[in-house]
Amino acid sequence: MNFAKKDLTDRCACCTIVREKQKGLKHMTVKAVIWDLDGTLLNTLEDLAASTNAALEACGMPTRTIDEVRRFVGNGIGKLMERAVPQGRENLLFQKAYDAFVAHYGAHSRDHTRPYDGVMEMLDKLSAKGVKLAIVSNKIDFAVKELSRDYFPGRMQVAVGDDPSRRRKPAPDSVLEAMRQMGVTREETVYVGDSDVDVETARNAGVTCCAVSWGFRSVQCLKDAGATRIAATPEELLAMLEAL
Protein backbone atom coordinates (compact mmCIF):
# COMPACT_ATOMS: atom_id res chain seq x y z
CA MET A 1 0.00 0.00 0.00
CA ASN A 2 1.30 3.47 -0.88
CA PHE A 3 1.06 5.24 2.50
CA ALA A 4 2.34 8.56 1.13
CA LYS A 5 -0.44 8.58 -1.44
CA LYS A 6 -3.03 7.63 1.22
CA ASP A 7 -1.82 10.44 3.51
CA LEU A 8 -2.12 12.95 0.68
CA THR A 9 -5.63 11.69 -0.11
CA ASP A 10 -6.69 11.97 3.54
CA ARG A 11 -5.33 15.51 3.80
CA CYS A 12 -7.13 16.54 0.62
CA ALA A 13 -10.37 15.06 1.94
CA CYS A 14 -9.90 16.94 5.21
CA CYS A 15 -9.30 20.19 3.35
CA THR A 16 -12.46 19.60 1.33
CA ILE A 17 -14.49 19.14 4.53
CA VAL A 18 -13.04 22.35 6.01
CA ARG A 19 -13.80 24.26 2.81
CA GLU A 20 -17.37 22.97 2.83
CA LYS A 21 -17.84 24.05 6.44
CA GLN A 22 -16.45 27.50 5.68
CA LYS A 23 -18.47 27.93 2.50
CA GLY A 24 -20.56 31.07 2.77
CA LEU A 25 -18.64 32.38 5.79
CA LYS A 26 -17.20 35.67 4.65
CA HIS A 27 -13.78 36.53 6.07
CA MET A 28 -14.00 39.21 8.74
CA THR A 29 -11.41 41.77 9.77
CA VAL A 30 -13.29 42.42 13.03
CA LYS A 31 -11.72 40.30 15.77
CA ALA A 32 -14.06 41.11 18.68
CA VAL A 33 -17.60 42.38 19.17
CA ILE A 34 -18.62 43.79 22.55
CA TRP A 35 -22.34 43.91 23.25
CA ASP A 36 -24.58 45.97 25.45
CA LEU A 37 -27.10 43.67 27.15
CA ASP A 38 -30.51 45.25 27.83
CA GLY A 39 -32.21 46.29 24.60
CA THR A 40 -29.43 44.85 22.46
CA LEU A 41 -29.17 41.13 23.19
CA LEU A 42 -31.98 40.68 25.71
CA ASN A 43 -35.47 42.17 25.71
CA THR A 44 -35.70 42.96 29.42
CA LEU A 45 -38.21 45.81 29.22
CA GLU A 46 -41.30 43.99 30.51
CA ASP A 47 -39.51 42.69 33.61
CA LEU A 48 -37.87 46.06 34.28
CA ALA A 49 -41.25 47.81 34.03
CA ALA A 50 -42.93 45.26 36.31
CA SER A 51 -40.26 45.66 38.99
CA THR A 52 -40.30 49.44 38.68
CA ASN A 53 -44.05 49.56 39.23
CA ALA A 54 -43.94 47.02 42.06
CA ALA A 55 -41.43 49.27 43.83
CA LEU A 56 -43.45 52.42 43.20
CA GLU A 57 -46.66 50.79 44.42
CA ALA A 58 -44.89 49.59 47.58
CA CYS A 59 -44.12 53.23 48.34
CA GLY A 60 -47.55 54.60 47.43
CA MET A 61 -46.23 56.30 44.30
CA PRO A 62 -47.88 56.51 40.86
CA THR A 63 -46.83 53.78 38.44
CA ARG A 64 -45.18 54.30 35.06
CA THR A 65 -46.11 53.13 31.58
CA ILE A 66 -43.85 50.74 29.74
CA ASP A 67 -42.91 53.52 27.30
CA GLU A 68 -41.84 55.71 30.21
CA VAL A 69 -39.68 52.91 31.59
CA ARG A 70 -38.21 52.42 28.11
CA ARG A 71 -36.99 56.02 28.24
CA PHE A 72 -35.68 55.65 31.79
CA VAL A 73 -33.38 52.64 31.27
CA GLY A 74 -29.80 52.70 30.01
CA ASN A 75 -27.76 54.07 32.90
CA GLY A 76 -28.22 51.42 35.57
CA ILE A 77 -30.79 50.80 38.29
CA GLY A 78 -30.00 53.96 40.23
CA LYS A 79 -30.80 56.22 37.28
CA LEU A 80 -33.86 54.15 36.38
CA MET A 81 -35.36 54.66 39.83
CA GLU A 82 -34.22 58.28 40.00
CA ARG A 83 -36.24 58.94 36.86
CA ALA A 84 -39.23 56.83 37.93
CA VAL A 85 -39.62 58.18 41.48
CA PRO A 86 -41.32 61.60 41.75
CA GLN A 87 -38.64 64.17 42.69
CA GLY A 88 -36.01 61.49 42.18
CA ARG A 89 -33.36 61.19 44.87
CA GLU A 90 -34.83 64.17 46.69
CA ASN A 91 -37.84 62.05 47.57
CA LEU A 92 -37.55 60.79 51.16
CA LEU A 93 -38.80 57.37 50.03
CA PHE A 94 -36.27 57.04 47.21
CA GLN A 95 -34.07 54.50 49.01
CA LYS A 96 -37.10 52.43 49.99
CA ALA A 97 -38.25 52.38 46.36
CA TYR A 98 -34.76 51.49 45.17
CA ASP A 99 -34.48 48.61 47.64
CA ALA A 100 -37.95 47.38 46.68
CA PHE A 101 -36.95 47.36 43.02
CA VAL A 102 -33.79 45.37 43.74
CA ALA A 103 -35.72 42.79 45.77
CA HIS A 104 -38.50 42.40 43.19
CA TYR A 105 -36.19 42.32 40.18
CA GLY A 106 -33.96 39.77 41.85
CA ALA A 107 -36.94 37.42 42.06
CA HIS A 108 -38.60 38.27 38.73
CA SER A 109 -35.81 39.35 36.34
CA ARG A 110 -36.42 36.37 34.04
CA ASP A 111 -40.20 36.17 34.00
CA HIS A 112 -40.45 37.58 30.47
CA THR A 113 -36.84 38.34 29.49
CA ARG A 114 -35.73 36.66 26.26
CA PRO A 115 -33.09 37.16 23.55
CA TYR A 116 -34.40 39.17 20.62
CA ASP A 117 -35.39 37.15 17.56
CA GLY A 118 -32.37 36.31 15.43
CA VAL A 119 -29.79 37.17 18.09
CA MET A 120 -28.72 33.60 18.88
CA GLU A 121 -28.26 32.75 15.22
CA MET A 122 -26.23 35.92 14.68
CA LEU A 123 -23.96 35.14 17.64
CA ASP A 124 -23.39 31.60 16.41
CA LYS A 125 -22.46 32.83 12.93
CA LEU A 126 -19.97 35.30 14.39
CA SER A 127 -18.47 32.60 16.60
CA ALA A 128 -18.12 30.34 13.57
CA LYS A 129 -16.05 33.06 11.92
CA GLY A 130 -13.71 33.13 14.93
CA VAL A 131 -14.95 36.46 16.29
CA LYS A 132 -14.57 36.90 20.05
CA LEU A 133 -17.72 38.01 21.87
CA ALA A 134 -18.20 39.90 25.14
CA ILE A 135 -20.94 41.66 27.10
CA VAL A 136 -20.50 45.03 28.80
CA SER A 137 -23.44 46.35 30.83
CA ASN A 138 -24.27 48.84 33.56
CA LYS A 139 -26.08 46.07 35.42
CA ILE A 140 -24.30 44.87 38.55
CA ASP A 141 -21.34 42.65 37.66
CA PHE A 142 -22.51 39.35 39.15
CA ALA A 143 -25.90 39.66 37.42
CA VAL A 144 -24.25 40.28 34.04
CA LYS A 145 -22.11 37.18 34.45
CA GLU A 146 -25.15 35.09 35.44
CA LEU A 147 -27.23 36.32 32.51
CA SER A 148 -24.36 35.74 30.11
CA ARG A 149 -23.92 32.19 31.35
CA ASP A 150 -27.62 31.34 31.43
CA TYR A 151 -28.82 32.96 28.20
CA PHE A 152 -25.68 32.67 26.06
CA PRO A 153 -23.88 29.52 27.27
CA GLY A 154 -20.52 28.96 25.61
CA ARG A 155 -20.84 32.05 23.43
CA MET A 156 -19.31 34.90 25.45
CA GLN A 157 -15.60 35.00 26.26
CA VAL A 158 -16.06 37.88 28.71
CA ALA A 159 -18.92 39.47 30.68
CA VAL A 160 -18.30 42.77 32.49
CA GLY A 161 -20.83 44.62 34.63
CA ASP A 162 -20.96 47.52 37.06
CA ASP A 163 -18.21 47.32 39.68
CA PRO A 164 -17.01 49.91 42.22
CA SER A 165 -13.49 49.69 40.77
CA ARG A 166 -14.66 51.01 37.37
CA ARG A 167 -16.64 53.97 36.11
CA ARG A 168 -19.90 52.93 34.49
CA LYS A 169 -20.80 53.57 30.86
CA PRO A 170 -20.50 55.95 29.04
CA ALA A 171 -17.01 55.95 30.57
CA PRO A 172 -14.82 53.53 28.58
CA ASP A 173 -13.55 51.53 31.58
CA SER A 174 -15.70 48.40 31.15
CA VAL A 175 -15.15 48.22 27.40
CA LEU A 176 -11.40 48.58 27.83
CA GLU A 177 -11.45 45.87 30.52
CA ALA A 178 -13.29 43.49 28.19
CA MET A 179 -10.77 44.23 25.43
CA ARG A 180 -7.91 43.57 27.83
CA GLN A 181 -9.34 40.21 28.82
CA MET A 182 -9.85 39.22 25.18
CA GLY A 183 -6.44 40.48 24.10
CA VAL A 184 -7.71 42.70 21.28
CA THR A 185 -6.96 46.25 20.16
CA ARG A 186 -9.27 49.19 19.48
CA GLU A 187 -8.81 48.73 15.75
CA GLU A 188 -10.00 45.10 15.99
CA THR A 189 -13.06 45.83 18.14
CA VAL A 190 -16.66 46.86 17.49
CA TYR A 191 -19.09 47.92 20.21
CA VAL A 192 -22.81 47.28 19.64
CA GLY A 193 -25.62 48.92 21.60
CA ASP A 194 -29.12 50.33 21.40
CA SER A 195 -28.83 53.71 23.13
CA ASP A 196 -27.22 57.12 23.09
CA VAL A 197 -25.19 55.96 26.10
CA ASP A 198 -23.77 53.12 24.01
CA VAL A 199 -22.83 55.42 21.14
CA GLU A 200 -21.00 57.67 23.59
CA THR A 201 -19.34 54.67 25.25
CA ALA A 202 -17.91 53.48 21.95
CA ARG A 203 -16.67 56.98 21.15
CA ASN A 204 -15.00 57.30 24.55
CA ALA A 205 -13.36 53.90 24.15
CA GLY A 206 -12.08 54.75 20.67
CA VAL A 207 -13.77 51.78 18.99
CA THR A 208 -16.13 51.44 16.03
CA CYS A 209 -19.80 51.64 16.97
CA CYS A 210 -22.74 49.81 15.42
CA ALA A 211 -26.09 50.84 16.88
CA VAL A 212 -29.29 48.78 16.74
CA SER A 213 -32.83 50.13 16.47
CA TRP A 214 -34.71 47.10 17.83
CA GLY A 215 -34.07 48.08 21.45
CA PHE A 216 -35.01 50.91 23.80
CA ARG A 217 -34.17 54.02 21.73
CA SER A 218 -35.44 55.43 18.45
CA VAL A 219 -33.40 55.76 15.27
CA GLN A 220 -33.53 59.54 15.65
CA CYS A 221 -32.15 59.33 19.19
CA LEU A 222 -29.27 57.20 17.94
CA LYS A 223 -28.56 59.60 15.07
CA ASP A 224 -28.68 62.58 17.41
CA ALA A 225 -26.06 60.81 19.55
CA GLY A 226 -23.79 60.52 16.51
CA ALA A 227 -24.48 56.98 15.31
CA THR A 228 -23.64 56.50 11.64
CA ARG A 229 -24.19 52.74 11.47
CA ILE A 230 -27.67 51.62 12.58
CA ALA A 231 -29.02 48.10 12.02
CA ALA A 232 -32.72 47.26 12.15
CA THR A 233 -32.31 43.48 12.48
CA PRO A 234 -29.63 41.01 13.60
CA GLU A 235 -29.27 39.91 9.98
CA GLU A 236 -28.61 43.49 8.91
CA LEU A 237 -26.11 43.90 11.74
CA LEU A 238 -24.24 40.76 10.70
CA ALA A 239 -23.89 42.10 7.16
CA MET A 240 -22.73 45.44 8.58
CA LEU A 241 -20.04 43.75 10.68
CA GLU A 242 -18.89 41.68 7.70
CA ALA A 243 -18.46 44.85 5.65
CA LEU A 244 -16.16 46.57 8.15
Descriptions of predicted regions:
Residues G74-A107, D117, D124-K125:
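A metal-dependent, Asp-based hydrolase signature
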Residues V190-A231:
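Acidic, Mg2+-coordinating phosphoryl-transfer loop and its flanking beta/alpha structural elements
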Residues N2, C15-I17, G24:
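Short, positively charged and aromatic/hydrophobic N-terminal segments
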Residues M28-R71:
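Active-site neighborhood of HAD-like aspartate-dependent phosphohydrolases
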Residues E57-C59, T63, L80-G88, H112, ...:
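Substrate-recognition/cap helix-loop segment adjacent to the acidic, metal-dependent catalytic center
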Residues F152-A159, L222-L241:
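Structural recognition of alpha->loop->beta junctions
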